[in-house]
Every structure is written in structure tokens, then in C-alpha cells.
């Protein structure tokens, strides 16, 4: 059996650190690939990079922008993605109000640096209950981001395709997770996603905002572990059945 690779796709300004709370548990389940979206300016190119640098079946787990990248992966290689987890994300196209606000942050990054971006961006992205230690770690991650990489990712998001009709056509196991305090990608937005994707399951984590993987790592890990285990077992059962049918021909 070719074991499915668990692909963890970070969001805007995020690197692999955002998945620190999940890596230990998930890496014991099978191969894990942490994607890097740096240097690319379209979601399509981000998806292509992942598909080109991995092999075989994939379980795609995307946070925020990473969820949109996961949808582009499915659009390009539907036979390779066997299960999907969407975390604090969406499928709609860019709204009219986004261009100005995103450009303001890009300009701030170029003129004042990523520390200034972190200070401007972070307050509305986390639950008020998020510990100070977690806040500092998230700020450090944002400060590590390159301003030009940040600008490229913002370009990708402003020019993203509207995938609302596409998600309604999905027919693969899908877990949708959000925080109850996410004001950027609201629980209502995720309820709409769950309604659109047939057979999907929605989980709302209490006392967590948009930076859910870091804010509520244990809760998210528990949800992902159960979902991924279920789909790895289904993959094994399917391959066993195929092998048995070949043996009787």
C-alpha cells in the first residue's frame, strides 16, 4: 500500500511553526509534508508546487490561505487528494473591500517592516483568551516572514478564484474546523461551506480565533487525528478489497 501523505499547508505570513502543535501526533500516523508557499504569487502555483514535490495519495490540511491552496490542489489533481481538512478558511472570491485593506498591509510591510504588520494585523486574529506566550510566538513567526513574500501572497489572495460552485461538487471526506471567536473567517462562513460540501463535518472550537492551530493546538490535533485515522483506515480497506478481487480473477 502507498500510504497517503498528510500535507499541512500554512496560511498568509505563516510558516511550518503554525503546525507545531499537530506535528508530533500526525507524524506518528504516516508521512507528513509541511508546505512552503514562499516566493509564489498565485494559489495555483502554490498548489502545483505541492503536487510536484509529493507523490501518491494525499490528505490535504489547509489553514486560512492554505485551505484555498488545498482546493486548488483538488481542482488540478482530484484523484490524488483522498481527504480534505479546511481550517479557518473560505471558498469565496475577493470582496470589493479587500484590495484596499490588503494593500495597506503590504505598504506597511515595505515601509516599516513585518513587525509593524504583526502589530497591525494580530489584534483581531485571536481570541481575547489567547495566552501571551502564544501571542509572542505568533508575532515572531510573522516577523520572520519576508515583506516581498508577504506581498506575493497578498497578490495571490486578491486574485484568487471563486470556488463556491466548485466546493459544491466535491465528493471526498471533508472536515471543516473553525474557532468560535474567528472574526476574519466566521463560523457562519464555515457553516455555509459545510452546507455546500455534501457529507462534510463541521467542528467549532471554543475560545479560539483565526489562528486556531496555535491557539487551540490540542483541540485541533484531536479532530485531525480522528479524521485522518478514519481515512487512512478507509484507504487500507479499499486497497485490501482491490487486492482480494485481483486474487480471485
Explain the meaning of each model-derived region.
Residues 1-47:
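Conserved HGGG/HGGXW glycine-rich cap/lid loop of the alpha/beta-hydrolase fold
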Residues 43, 75-76, 80-119, 125:
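Flexible "cap/lid" loop of the alpha/beta hydrolase fold
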Residues 43-58:
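Conserved acidic catalytic loop of the alpha/beta-hydrolase fold
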Residues 200-249:
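Catalytic active-site module of serine/aspartate enzymes centered on a nucleophile-bearing elbow/loop
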Residues 94-97, 112-168:
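Conserved alpha/beta-hydrolase catalytic His-Asp/Glu region
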Residues 62-66, 70:
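Gly/Ala-rich beta-loop-alpha elbow adjacent to hydrolase catalytic centers
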Residues 172, 186-195:
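Short alpha-helix in the alpha/beta-hydrolase fold that links the catalytic acid
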Residues 170, 176-178, 182:
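Short beta-strand/loop motif that positions the catalytic acidic residue
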Amino acid at each position: 500500500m502507498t500510504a497517503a501523505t498528510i500535507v499541512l499547508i500554512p496560511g498568509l505570513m505563516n510558516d511550518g511553526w503554525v503546525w507545531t502543535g499537530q506535528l508530533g501526533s500526525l507524524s506518528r500516523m504516516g508521512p507528513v509534508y509541511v508546505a512552503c508557499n514562499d516566493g509564489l504569487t498565485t494559489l495555483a502555483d502554490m498548489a502545483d508546487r505541492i503536487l510536484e514535490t509529493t507523490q501518491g495519495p494525499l490528505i490535504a490540511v489547509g489553514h486560512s490561505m492554505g485551505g484555498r491552496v488545498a482546493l486548488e490542489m483538488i481542482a488540478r489533481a482530484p484523484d490524488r487528494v483522498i481527504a480534505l481538512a479546511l481550517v479557518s478558511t473560505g471558498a469565496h472570491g475577493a470582496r470589493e473591500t479587500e484590495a484596499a485593506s490588503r494593500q495597506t498591509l503590504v505598504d506597511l510591510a515595505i515601509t516599516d517592516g513585518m513587525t509593524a504588520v504583526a502589530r497591525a494585523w494580530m489584534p483581531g486574529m485571536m481570541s481575547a483568551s489567547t495566552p501571551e506566550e502564544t501571542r509572542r510566538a505568533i508575532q515572531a513567526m510573522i516577523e520572520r516572514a519576508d515583506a516581498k513574500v508577504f506581498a506575493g501572497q497578498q497578490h495571490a489572495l486578491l486574485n484568487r478564484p471563486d470556488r463556491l460552485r466548485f466546493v459544491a461538487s466535491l465528493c471526498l471526506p471533508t472536515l471543516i474546523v473553525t474557532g468560535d471567536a474567528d472574526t476574519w473567517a466566521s463560523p457562519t462562513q464555515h457553516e455555509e461551506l459545510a452546507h455546500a460540501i455534501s457529507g462534510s463535518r463541521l467542528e467549532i472550537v471554543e475560545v479560539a480565533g483565526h489562528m486556531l492551530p496555535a491557539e487551540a493546538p490540542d483541540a485541533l490535533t484531536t479532530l485531525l487525528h480522528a479524521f485522518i485515522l478514519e481515512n487512512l483506515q478507509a484507504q487500507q480497506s479499499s486497497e485490501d478489497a482491490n487486492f482480494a478481487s485481483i486474487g480471485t480473477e
